[in-house]
A protein has these predicted regions:
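One-carbon transfer enzymes
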Residues: 1-160
Length: 160
């Protein structure tokens, strides 16, 4: 990990980064030049998003073609797009007629949640149909699988 970049102050993350000797920077506005400059300064090759809710500017995407990975807390493409994050996604899943939910790890492109899907992990909604139960199980899957997918994609360089 060459850099952790946040859109908000985060004392716990800052403390973790100091302990791990990882640079930590806060940029609270999405200006592609500022993000590009910080990534270039730290010689970043891959960008991993987690909990990043803003649209990524095209100039930033162009600077990291097929090298921006995001996680989505539902199975795409059905529960994706602008406004589909956090509890909004879990509420939509809970109110739907689907029998499964899960997570999607995907590349980022110019459209919300439309990049190439790298991996999906699903679970049955049987006995887990409340928003809270869905959210809880999604978090378990995120913690278990997101690091594994990132590692395998970066090590294998499967994206060309």
């Amino acid at each position: 990990v060459g850099l952790i970049l946040s859109s908000a102050q985060n004392p716990l993350m800052n403390e973790f980064c100091v302990e791990q000797n990882i640079p930590f920077e806060v940029l609270n506005h999405m200006e592609s030049d500022a993000y590009l400059n910080v990534c270039q300064k730290h010689e970043i090759n891959w960008v991993i998003l987690a909990g990043f809710l803003k649209k990524i500017p095209e100039a930033f995407i162009e600077a990291f073609p097929n090298r921006i990975i995001n996680i989505h807390p539902a199975l795409l493409p059905r529960f994706g797009g602008k406004g589909m994050y956090g509890k909004h996604v879990h509420e939509a899943v809970s109110k739907s007629t689907v029998h499964f939910s899960g997570i999607t790890v995907h590349l980022v492109n110019e459209e919300f949640d439309k990049g190439m899907i790298l991996a999906q992990y699903a679970f049955s909604l049987k006995n887990r149909s409340s928003t809270e139960a869905i959210e809880s199980h999604v978090r378990i899957l995120e913690m278990k699988y997101f690091p594994r997918v990132i590692e395998s994609v970066i090590q294998a360089e499967i994206i060309e």
